[in-house]
Amino acid sequence: MRYWYKAFEFLKLKHSYIFYKTPTNITYWWNFGVLSLYFLIIQVLTGVFLAMFYDPSILYAFSSIMFINNEIYYGWWIRGLHANGASFFFLCVYFHMFRGLYYSSFLYPRQLLWKSGVIIFLLMVVTAFLGYVLPWGQMSFRGAMVITSLLSSIPLIGNDIVFLLWGGFTIEDATLHRFYALHFLLPFILLFLSIIHISLLHETGSTNPLGIPSMYEIIPFTPYFILKDVLSILIFLVFILYINYTNPDMLGHTLNYQMANFLVTPPHIVPEWYLLFFYAILRSIPNKLLGFIAMVLSIVVLLVIPYIMKNSIIRSGSFRPCHKLFFWIFLVICILLAWIGGIPVIEPYLTTGRILSILYFVNILILFPLGIFIDKILYDIYIIKNRK
């Protein structure tokens, strides 16, 4: 409770940002946390603008998007910034999470910091799915049908949950109103949780590539690391503005530029690229309920990492060869799952997706703890040899 109490001490935030002591050896990999917050703010600001013109009804939702693109002054630019900003937001968060995993940023005393980040990520996925449905294109509608129907597999209460979510016996205006309201609300909750996340970070202090707490090799956050953050933000801003001006629809699916049609089903339903990983796990399991559980567990399992890897003597992955090996294997598994999620459900990709889904959980629950054990043995051998 002490950490949560201090996390709400908002009056200390200004002092914390200016005089926060930061290790001198942290690299640009540590900038993705700030970049994630930056793109979250962009999403909120552009989302508020789009909310002024969006009509959450199955008859006019798609038309209102076209109206924003074609009739509102610079509406196409703001909507492109919102759509592409979501991709950049997830990209930065993924880099941020994998960096934390590689350098063991979840170890004591940062367990609560890691868990708050996982909760933020879970809400991000939900928010992104809700936003994906709102344009009411062909892919949006079918994606909403597939994902919301999964809830019906929950025993006893599944059908009631789906009925409550849909607002009826099928997806209709009430569904879009619900999704619209939740999609507008959740980013503000994400901002609130992000403030807590940052406060927890400033309470425990930042890690560094060496994984060794330092009481002397530290400098104030301002102005040194502010300049690094600003440089990173400017670089990413150039990239997103270039995409937004040259090809704002580059990251969108072609079928989502067709209005939703209840009578036509696309041959291959895919979500946005940043959700393909979860979609691959979902469809790899033939049972609807088990697939839904596996998809949720793929995020929830990240909460147990601080406990199953708490016995690590060496923190940084740079000095743990087995952890480093299993980390890169894990990264390759995640990338392959995302690739499988964008491919039609045919052999051999279906079997490959099932194998990779199993390996994902095996890597987290077995290989990572095993790596700690092996690295400890290697460390003991090294100590014994040097004593001689």
Where in this protein do the model-derived segments appear?
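Membrane-embedded and interfacial regions of multi-pass energy-transducing membrane proteins
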Residues: 1-388
